[in-house]
Structure formats: C-alpha cells, structure tokens
Amino acid sequence: MSLVPITNVGEHGIVKDINSWQLPPNAWTEGNNIRAEHNAIQKSPGYLEVMASCPIAPYFITNLEVGGANYWIVGGLAKIYVHNGTTWTDITRASGGDYSATARENWTATVLGGILVMSNGYDAPQFWALAAGIPAVATKMADLTYWPASTECKSLRAFKSFLIALNVTKSTVPYTSLVKWSTAAATQAVPVSWDETSATVDAGEYALEDSKGIIVDGLPLRGEFMIYKQYSTYKMSYVGNPFIFAFTQLSPNVGALAKNCIREFDGGHFVMAYGDMYINSGDKL
C-alpha cells in the first residue's frame, strides 16, 4: 500500500461535531493533550499554576497597564490584592471595612482614563486613584467619589467618558432594568456627578422595561454600548443634549447568561447566552 502524504495537519484541529467521512484528510476527529497551531500539531504544554502565592482566593482577576506599569488585580470576597510583578499588596479600602462580594455575583472591572473601577453589587463601587498618572501599590482602593449614597449596581462599565451602572439598587430597593450613567469625566478623573435631576450635568437614567428579565451586563462595541438582559439585548447610542443617550432593542430573544460572559473580538461580541452562544456584530445577533 502506498503512503499518502498529508500536509497542514493542524489547519482544522480536532472536529468532533461532523462525520469523519465529511472531513478533509487533514482534519482530526479525536485527540488528547495536543493543540493545533501554525498548521501543525503540537504537544499541549498543560497547566501552570499562577496564583499559588496569592494571599486570597482569586474569585476575580483583571489586568491594568498604565504608563508602562503592569498590574494584576485580584478581587476576593472580602479584600482586593494587586501584584506588581514582584509582590502582592493588599489594596482593600482603608475605610468602610471588608467587602461583601459573593461567589455567585462576583466582581466587574472597567477602566476609565486609566482609573480602575470595580463593583460587586453589594458595596459602593471601588476605584484605584492615580498618582502622577499611574496607580501605586501604596494607594488603597476607595469608595467611588461622587457615587450616590445607599446605592449599588450589579455591573459598572466605562463607555466614552462616562461610567454606566447597570441593574441598580437604591436604598435596598432593586431596579433590575435600570441603566444609570454619570456625567462625562475629565481626563484621568472620575465623574463628578450622578445626579439625573440636574440640568447642568449629563448624568441620567433610563429603564429598559419593555422586555422580561433583569439587566445582566454590558460592554462597548465600537461607537455604541451594548446592554444585555437575560433574554434581550439593547443598543445604547450617544446622541448628546438633551437626552444624552438613545436606546434601541437589538434582539428581543437573546441576552447574556451571567456577568462577565461577554467578550469583545475583532468581529463584535462573543456572548454566552441561555442554551447557546452568539456573535453580536453590532447590527444583529
């Protein structure tokens, strides 16, 4: 029997959901401890523990790179730690006590003008102030300046020069369909107002009440902000005064499964939803 040369053996990788006789010769139907890369098959290097030295259980991890400085920030249930490439430092807020985060809700993180802002849905949002344009491990997290009292949000995201709070609780009353945005922030500063009743700032609120389910999360997509409820998706567009933002329903049937289940890539958003996974191109899901 003659040998048949097969090239580009890593072109397709492992394909399990198509019948083997329908696949090209250089596709694999099964494999263990291998990975396809550069049109070749390589041995998988396995796993390497990277948080062994972290002083707390790393329920949430995010990266911040500002002015040449690179930090890994870990959110635990009660504290926040940062790693500067050498050591771990506790940057939990100095006043207000430990946090009340839960494993179920967890944290969200966003960056506005180089300032890291985190929220867990149970405490006031936290921000890491800059010193000479960069954060310092000696600086503690603190309750977000100008944030309204007795108010929490399940997710907090940056969009343009604004902070967008999603699924808001006011004085223990949940407004699960409420979108609340700040006034525009100055460079390397947090917004100075969240007062939706003031005519002198751009802060405002809008309730997405024409569909079922609660607001889960949101992320910018090119020039717009996508808001994901449990079973629907909305587009938030900047229109300026007097309304500041306009809201349009993008999908009445597809939302997001949970917080941090949306990721941006070159073609749009990759969304984990109930029962399936979707691509949000900005025009449709």
Model-assigned labels for residue ranges:
Residues V82, F127-A129, K235, I279:
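Conserved blade-register residue in beta-propeller folds
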Residues P5-G10, S211-L285:
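Beta-sheet-dominated scaffold domains
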Residues D123-A124, T169-V173, Y278:
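Short glycine/acidic-enriched loop and turn motifs that connect beta-strands
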Residues G96-G113:
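Beta-sandwich interaction modules
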Residues L130-R157:
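Asp-box/WD-like beta-propeller blade repeats and closely related beta-sheet repeat scaffolds
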Residues D90-A94, A136-T145, V192-D195, F245-L250:
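Beta-propeller fold detector
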Residues N84-T86, L130-G133, V239-N241, D283:
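Short loop/turn segments that connect beta-strands within beta-propeller blades
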